Amino acid sequence: LRQDIGEVQIDAGTVYEDVLNFVRAVMPSFENKIKLYKDEIPLFSRYQIEGQIETAFQREVMLPSCGSIVIDPTEALVSIDINSSRATKGHDIEETALQTNLEAAEEIARQLRLRDMGGLIVIDFIDMTPAKHQREVEQKMREALEIDRARVQVGKISRFGLLEMSRQRLRPSLGETRSEGGPVPVTHLPLPP
C-alpha cells in the first residue's frame, strides 16, 4: 500500500478479514483504505478489469478513433507503431493524424504502466507535417506519463516521426511474470489509474 492508493476493494469475506488483520498489525494508518465489496455486479465487471487484463497481452490495442497501436517488445527495445485505419476521404489528413497520435500517446502511457515495460522505447507516430502538431503530441505524451511512478525520459519526435524514450522498470514486465500458458496471478497486475 502507498499513500496514492485511494482504497483496496476485496470481494471475498475471508480474504477481506485476513487483509484487514494484516493491515491493522503492519500499517494501521491504511486500515480505512481496505473495503469489502458487496455489490451484486462482480468486482471485475464493475471496473472492467478483465478487459484491461486482456489488452495487456494483446500485441494490437485499439484506439477510440478506430486507429490502433502495435506493441512489439524485442531484446533491444520496445517498438510501438501507431496505425490509423480511419478513412481520410473528405477529412483533413493532418487533423486525423494529430487526433490519432494524441489518443495513442495516452494509451501508450497507460499500456507501459499496465505492462510495466522498461528500457528503450521507440514510438513510430503517424507522420505530421506541422511542427506544432509534433510538439502537441510530445506534450500529450509527457502529460500522460506524469502519473507514472517509474523514472521516464522522453525525447522529441524526429524528422522520421519517431519518438525515443526510456522508462525504468519497477518489477518484471507482465510478459515475464506470466507462466507458460497458465493463468496470470491477478495480484501481480499493476493496474493503471
Question: What annotation goes with each model-predicted range?
Answer:
Residues 1-69, 74, 156-185, 193:
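OB-fold/S1-family RNA-binding modules
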Residues 63-185, 193:
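Conserved glycine-centered short motifs in functionally critical loops
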